């Protein structure tokens, strides 16, 4: 809109400047009565001087509008080229349907090298990101995984084996004839050791995760269930639907599953845990549910490291994280992660 006002104003100034210059010259060198007669002569009932002013204004509006429209076209085209350059697209002077002014072409020619520089910077940034990802993924993660493997072996070879041996010894002692007070204490000690052993297995699960490697998320969860069924007294069942899951979120979902099961083994005091994975076309649903003692979500969710960790992993992949639990009613964790239609329909 400003272009229109500027163009019309410029035309009015130019025309009226010319008009008053002619008037001044006539006043000095010619008979002024010619101009005075314009006040009395009429065209269509309008004084000639007023009619001429109206015609001049109308002409200036028409010419100024045309010029302003062309200038506006040039500016819109330049703005479009700049936006394309910012987005990393290639700018080109051949894809326009308007006649460019020389000034516009000069401005465009300064934009071309900037566009090329932006493209180079984007490629460098992408390469740096890839290099950083490779370093973190290959080296840093390998170091962390190696350390976890070492700690897991040490815990399994020492603490877990010792607790198991102590549990067997206490079971044997309980079967012998003992005095009543000691006979009452042994079951308590046995229960404590069993709980400790279960917690150690949960920690081992957290420290030494079963890697997905070339397996799908569903296959990884099934292998995890098989491994758990051999080691824990709790019944572990699963209902896994096989479908393609983007690699970028598989690891996070698998770690969430491990964290949830670890928390269940350590805290739920339940006898059964169920793991479910379903494809809902636009999203996948991961659900882990137990029949344990439950808890008050408002009191625990901000204090539990495991729950915080699961929530953060879900947020990193754009998923929603919901937990439902009531005292003596068990706990249910649900993670909904968005899926592309191409991914959800793939075999």
Swiss-Prot record:
Keyword ATP-binding: yes
Root EC class: transferase
Keyword Transcription regulation: no
Classification via InterPro entries: HATPase_C_sf, LiaS/VraS, Sensor_HK_TwoCompSys, Sig_transdc_His_kin_sub3_dim/P
Documented EC number(s): 2.7.13.3
GO molecular function list: ATP binding; phosphorelay sensor kinase activity; protein dimerization activity
Span of domain Histidine kinase: 150-341
Subcellular location: Cell membrane
Record keywords, A-Z: ATP-binding, Cell membrane, Kinase, Membrane, Nucleotide-binding, Phosphoprotein, Transferase, Transmembrane, Transmembrane helix, Two-component regulatory system
Catalysed reaction, written as an equation: ATP + protein L-histidine = ADP + protein N-phospho-L-histidine
Membrane topology label: Multi-pass membrane protein
A GO cellular-component term linked to this record: plasma membrane
Gene3D superfamilies associated with the record: 1.20.5.1930, Histidine kinase-like ATPase, C-terminal domain
CDD domains hit by this protein: HATPase_UhpB-NarQ-NarX-like
Membrane spanning residue stretches: 13-33, 43-63
Superkingdom of the source species: Bacteria
Pfam family, one: HisKA_3
Function of the protein: Member of the two-component regulatory system VraS/VraR involved in the control of the cell wall peptidoglycan biosynthesis. Probably activates VraR by phosphorylation.
PANTHER family associated with the record: NITRATE/NITRITE SENSOR PROTEIN NARX-RELATED, SENSOR HISTIDINE KINASE NARS
The protein's name: Sensor protein VraS
Organism: Staphylococcus saprophyticus subsp. saprophyticus (strain ATCC 15305 / DSM 20229 / NCIMB 8711 / NCTC 7292 / S-41)
